């Protein structure tokens, strides 16, 4: 081989070596930048240096949860709930041969990775206070899971007074931890403050997918136990009375897990013609109330349940003539965010923000704008009857069924099968200035009438229910006798397929039994038994 060829090959090797060295250097630089960025993120998210030493994997944190524990989690609806530790616990339990059970406390419903997967894995012994998951519902209705369905505003006091067992360990999602070891909550507050205060240990999930700009939305204020309880100093929906963090302290935090997963909120269905008709009827009623001087021009603070009908009603307010509105509610969904964006709402107070997957990018993009209009509170404050009565809430919630005297069933299908739970509807219904329940007049393609002679389960009595709205019309029950209520509901709210049947029942009951609230007890629940036997109430 000639000397020239050797020199040429040597040069090529040197060039390759140089290229390799450059690539290695680039990788080192990139790695350094990643490490530097990670350190910067950690510093912003975990501002207490000693607590940075408590960062562990989700698997390590899950090992801290023991069989028989009372486990409490943050969040309210699929917002602000822990994402990774619950998954790790499911994986751990599925690998075990022996039984592993916990009692689960939440604020409200939660993510499917908890309610759904834990139910399927047989992890949950007892569940309090509310759920919306189909797997959980199945286990509740077959008796596998003991379910205590309670008014959401009661939960914190039950824990504070040890009416229910104390919390062993709380798993809390956070935006950040402060220098003092306190927690900046994310999109769902719920019972977080109460859980943290009462838990022996706290696992914190720092979720980098939750924007740091969420800091400042929370207004954390907790109540003293009676007899030392003081009036809550809220006189309008926008009042801030607490802190922007949940008091914890670094000693109580036993583990920190870094996550990067967005809330898996539910997509909202399109507004159906029936939902739109309910919305139109309700807004027409509110307009009439303003014209008659029963409501101010900007209404009173609005509380609304969740779902397509509620969304349609609130969406209708965007197209209405109302302005300078306020909301004092639980869940802030798309329609409330849109009320803010369209300039109709000045302030919205709730305990969680639960935008649909379609609305989430817009919320994040405009988060600084929304932060000036939104207040997130613990649910014992967002759902507090004292405040609802003081500020005069307009409460709008959904009924499963209503009877001719205005009693409402919100929870049980055919009287026995749990659907979701009472949630916060009872917190507001008895204490609101105006209590409205909406429902479609029929279900199951017309085989079920949502207005029946007697409800198969009672969540809200006739004494709490003021107005019923269906796509057929509005029944204003205020100041009416039971017999007058029956006529108003049958004439205004019942589907044509069932109107004559209901009037026939009512007239027969008046003749056969009479009384202030006439019922034929032999036939009062016959519509339900007929459906169970034949598949139709007709």
Curated annotation (Swiss-Prot):
The record's section on SUPFAM superfamilies has: NagB/RpiA/CoA transferase-like
Catalytic positions? 330 (5-glutamyl coenzyme a thioester intermediate)
Reactions catalysed, as given in the entry: succinyl-CoA + acetate = succinate + acetyl-CoA
Top-level taxon of origin: Bacteria
InterPro entries, alphabetized: AcetylCoA_hyd_C, AcetylCoA_hyd_C_sf, ActCoA_hydro, ActCoA_hydro_N, NagB/RpiA_transferase-like, Succinate_CoA_transferase
Which biological processes are named by the entry's GO terms? Answer: acetate metabolic process; acetyl-CoA metabolic process
Quick one: which residues bind CoA? 305-309, 420, 424
In alphabetical order, the GO MF annotations are:
acetate CoA-transferase activity; acetyl-CoA hydrolase activity
Protein keywords: Transferase
Entry-linked Pfam families: AcetylCoA_hyd_C (PF13336), AcetylCoA_hydro (PF02550)
Keyword Transmembrane helix among UniProt keywords: no
Which Gene3D superfamilies did the record assign? 4-hydroxybutyrate coenzyme like domains (3.30.750.70), Acetyl-CoA hydrolase/transferase C-terminal domain (3.40.1080.20), Glutaconate Coenzyme A-transferase (3.40.1080.10)
Instruction: Write down the EC number.
Output: 2.8.3.18
- What induces or represses expression of this protein, per its UniProt record? Efficiently transcribed only during growth on ethanol plus succinate.
* Annotated family: Belongs to the acetyl-CoA hydrolase/transferase family.
Q: In UniProt terms, what function does this protein have?
A: Forms succinyl-CoA from succinate and acetyl-CoA.
**Name of protein:** Succinyl-CoA:acetate CoA-transferase
Source organism of this protein record: Clostridium kluyveri (strain ATCC 8527 / DSM 555 / NBRC 12016 / NCIMB 10680 / K1)
Q: What is the lineage of its organism?
A: Bacteria, Bacillati, Bacillota, Clostridia, Eubacteriales
What gene is this protein translated from? Answer: cat1
């Amino acid at each position: 081989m000639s000397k020239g060829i050797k020199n040429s090959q040597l040069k090529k090797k040197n060039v390759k070596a140089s290229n390799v060295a450059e690539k290695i250097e680039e990788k080192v630089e990139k790695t350094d930048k990643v490490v530097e960025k990670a350190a910067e993120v950690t510093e912003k998210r975990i501002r207490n240096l000693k607590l940075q030493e408590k960062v562990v994997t989700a698997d390590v944190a899950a090992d801290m949860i023991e069989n028989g524990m009372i486990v409490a989690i943050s969040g309210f609806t699929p917002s602000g709930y822990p994402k990774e530790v619950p998954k790790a616990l499911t994986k751990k339990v599925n690998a075990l041969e022996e039984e592993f059970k916990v009692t689960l406390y939440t604020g409200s419903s939660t993510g499917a990775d908890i309610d759904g997967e834990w139910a399927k894995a047989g992890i949950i012994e007892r569940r309090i206070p509310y759920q919306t998951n189909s797997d959980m519902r199945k286990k509740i209705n077959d008796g596998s899971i003991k379910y205590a369905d309670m008014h959401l505003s009661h939960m914190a006091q039950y824990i504070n007074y040890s009416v229910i067992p104390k919390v062993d360990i709380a798993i809390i999602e956070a935006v950040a931890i402060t220098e003092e070891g306190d927690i900046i909550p994310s999109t769902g507050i719920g019972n977080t403050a109460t859980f943290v205060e009462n838990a022996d240990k706290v696992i914190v999930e720092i979720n980098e997918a939750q924007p740091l700009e969420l800091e400042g939305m929370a207004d954390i204020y907790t109540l003293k136990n009676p007899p030392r309880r003081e009036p809550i100093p809220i006189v309008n929906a926008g009042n801030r009375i607490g802190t922007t963090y949940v008091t914890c302290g670094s000693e109580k935090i036993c583990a920190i897990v870094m996550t990067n997963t967005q809330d898996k909120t539910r997509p909202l269905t399109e507004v159906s013609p029936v939902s739109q008709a309910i919305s139109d009827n309700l807004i027409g009623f509110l307009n009439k109330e303003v014209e008659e001087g029963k409501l101010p021009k900007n209404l009173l603070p609005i509380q609304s349940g969740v779902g397509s009908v509620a969304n349609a009603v609130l969406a209708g307010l965007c197209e209405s003539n109302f302005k300078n509105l306020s909301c004092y509610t639980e869940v802030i969904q798309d329609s409330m965010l849109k009320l803010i964006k369209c300039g109709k709402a000045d302030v919205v107070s709730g305990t969680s923000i639960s935008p649909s997957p379609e609305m989430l990018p817009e919320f994040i993009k405009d988060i600084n704008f929304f932060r000036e209009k939104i207040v997130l509170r613990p649910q014992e404050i967002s759902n507090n009857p004292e405040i609802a009565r003081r500020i005069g809430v307009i409460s709008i919630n959904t009924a499963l069924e209503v009877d001719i005297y205005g009693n409402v069933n919100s929870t049980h299908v055919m009287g026995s099968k749990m659907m979701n739970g009472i949630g916060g509807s009872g917190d507001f219904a008895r204490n609101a200035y105006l209590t409205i329940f909406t429902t479609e007049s029929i279900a199951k393609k017309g085989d079920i009438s949502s207005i029946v002679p007697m409800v198969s389960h009672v969540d809200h009595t006739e004494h709490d229910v003021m107005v019923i709205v269906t796509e057929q019309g509005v029944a204003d029950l205020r100041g009416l006798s039971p017999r007058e209520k029956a006529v108003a509901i049958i004439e205004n709210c019942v589907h044509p397929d069932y109107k004559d049947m209901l009037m026939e029942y009512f007239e027969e009951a008046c003749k056969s039994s009479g009384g202030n609230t006439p019922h034929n007890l032999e036939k009062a629940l016959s519509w339900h038994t007929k459906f169970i036997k034949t598949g139709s109430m007709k």
